[in-house]
């Protein structure tokens, strides 16, 4: 493929006046022939601090080979990544959600600065997936995202295990039901190699969502990280971006209100992570699509929960792939007349056309038939009430609690709540409240997996509820309300809750309330003394000053 005047790189490379640019590119190995072809950015999120992204260098080489085979010149560059699983429960976790914005900004800046004609983004860990797609939305050049794939399950005492089991084992160990030796054995075997966390946690949730959004080729993200076919997928994606360039298909033609609704439906039917609400709101904003937190509840009301996936179910993402994968999920939802089948994807085919290729493993138990759903409605609900005027998100996949009332145990930060659980201070019937962990108040809206897993590990998963203006990991299960908005630091009612107040979750009525009058809440809020900002400078301080509410996607 020769340079077409439509291609941005024409302005970077052509003519005598661009000799300095060509000279610098030749210094790193590019030839005249290379520079006559379209330049395709390969935005990698490789990092060696975690298994999720550790193998992406291998995949990027195959992506680049595919680009070359189709007549393009790949230029690889890297951005940052922060491991949720490693930083969980520490001050470091505050960097996680903030990294989504930095990932998007950095991918965008490099691509704009070097006038790339197209981009392939490689992602793995939680925030790299939405971060890469947000960048592609902004750039609006022919582009796609490829997910590195799920880790395979580990083995412990004859059972499949994931990182979720290790977090919950910490609670069991504290409760005295797991020995030091057992914890060490589990630690050593839970994560057998590269790939993202294995359940329907945030990474796999967003990988599926973005196939249904159309920005990743259907059925390809689900190929596990160490499956030999993943290299073929990467090569195919390299060729595919050149096809998108030839046809001039761009994200704005793919990502629409209807494709976002398809993505929400995919999250709903697979029991996906609450983080999908934040990330899809953010993507919608990048594309100028009107989307509210209430839209998630409307769609979840009409979508059946079909996938029996961890953390609330029995199976892993690798099991779903073996059962038939996302094309089978798409077929189920099209048969139910839930999806918009006419939405185009990066393959150039519609999601309806992709679903026609679905196959199903005989006797598979991972994805239920429409006639026998796990639940008649989806895995997420949005609650509002005097504690969450702008809303909050509850994951109902994996539990059947529809009503819960109990006295509040209030903590100003995650670490204090974790210590209380470890010390046995949380009892059956309690409602744990963790505040000042929101987007601005944290800052960074930490995930509370350390606390929620400790609660489950202590045997209190069905008898204790939790609410926070922070987030939850996709590995969280039990009655947990996150993203409570407005957040405490912005004067949200959660700041006025006192230990002993009775808090009620009513899933059926979609309500979250504290048994205090509006007059009393208002009086309390006037007397609240918010903690001083924890960060005044650097990226944390800047984020705290500019980030929006969780109900708007926590964007900057």
PLM features: what roles do these ranges have?
Residues 1-54, 59-80, 85-86, 91-96, ...:
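Catalytic or ion-coupling anion/metal-binding cores of large enzyme and transporter domains
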Residues 96-105:
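Glycine-rich, highly charged phosphate/nucleotide-binding loops
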Residues 111-132, 144-147:
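A short, small-residue-rich loop immediately preceding and capping a beta-strand
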């Amino acid at each position: 493929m020769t340079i077409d005047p439509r291609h941005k790189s024409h302005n970077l490379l052509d003519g005598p006046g661009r000799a300095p640019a060509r000279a610098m590119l030749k210094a790193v190995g590019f030839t005249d022939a290379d520079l006559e072809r379209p330049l395709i950015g390969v935005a990698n999120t490789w990092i060696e601090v975690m298994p999720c992204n550790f193998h992406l260098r291998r995949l990027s080489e195959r992506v680049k080979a595919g680009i070359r085979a189709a007549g393009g010149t790949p230029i690889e560059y890297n951005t940052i990544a922060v491991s949720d699983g490693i930083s969980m429960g520490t001050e470091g976790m505050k960097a996680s959600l903030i990294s989504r914005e930095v990932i998007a900004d950095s991918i965008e800046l490099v691509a704009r600065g070097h006038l790339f004609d197209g981009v392939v983004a490689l992602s793995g860990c939680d925030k790299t997936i939405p971060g890469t797609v947000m960048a592609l939305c902004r750039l609006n050049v022919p582009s796609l995202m490829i997910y590195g794939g799920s880790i395979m399950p580990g083995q412990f005492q004859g059972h499949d295990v994931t990182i979720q089991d290790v977090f919950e084992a910490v609670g069991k160990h504290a409760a005295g039901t797991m020995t030091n030796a057992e914890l060490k054995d589990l630690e050593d075997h839970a994560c057998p190699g590269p790939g993202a966390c294995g359940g329907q946690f945030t990474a796999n949730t967003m990988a599926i969502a973005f196939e249904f959004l159309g920005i990743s080729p259907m059925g390809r993200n689900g190929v596990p990280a160490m499956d030999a076919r993943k290299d073929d997928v990467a090569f195919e994606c390299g060729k595919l971006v050149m096809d998108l360039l030839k046809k001039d298909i761009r994200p704005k033609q793919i990502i629409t209100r209807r494709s976002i609704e398809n993505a929400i439906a995919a999250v709903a039917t697979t029991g996906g992570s609450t983080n999908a609400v934040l990330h899809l709101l953010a993507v919608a904003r990048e594309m100028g699509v009107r989307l509210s937190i209430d839209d998630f509840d409307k769609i979840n009301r009409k979508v059946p929960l079909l996938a029996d996936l961890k953390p609330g179910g029995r199976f892993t993402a690798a099991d779903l792939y073996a059962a038939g994968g996302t094309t089978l999920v798409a077929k189920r939802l099209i048969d139910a007349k839930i999806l918009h089948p006419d939405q185009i994807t990066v393959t150039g085919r519609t999601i309806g056309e992709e679903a026609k290729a679905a196959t199903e493993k005989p006797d598979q138990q991972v994805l239920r038939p429409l006639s026998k759903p796990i639940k008649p409605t989806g895995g997420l609900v949005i609650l509002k009430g005097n504690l969450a005027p702008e809303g909050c998100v509850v994951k109902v996949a994996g539990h059947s609690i529809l009503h819960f009332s109990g006295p509040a145990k209030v903590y100003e930060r995650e670490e204090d709540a974790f210590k209380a659980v470890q010390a046995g201070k949380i009892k059956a019937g309690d409602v744990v409240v963790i505040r000042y962990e929101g987007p601005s108040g944290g800052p960074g809206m930490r995930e509370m997996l350390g606390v929620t897993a400790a609660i489950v590990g202590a045997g209190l998963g069905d008898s204790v509820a939790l609410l926070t203006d922070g987030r939850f990991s996709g590995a969280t299960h039990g009655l947990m309300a996150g993203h409570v908005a407005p957040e405490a630091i912005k004067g949200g009612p959660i700041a006025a809750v006192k230990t002993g107040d009775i808090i009620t979750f009513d899933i059926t009525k979609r309500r979250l309330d504290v048994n205090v009058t509006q007059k009393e809440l208002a009086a309390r809020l006037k007397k609240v003394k918010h903690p001083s900002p924890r960060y005044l400078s650097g990226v944390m301080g800047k984020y705290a000053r500019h980030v929006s509410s969780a109900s708007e996607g926590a964007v900057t």
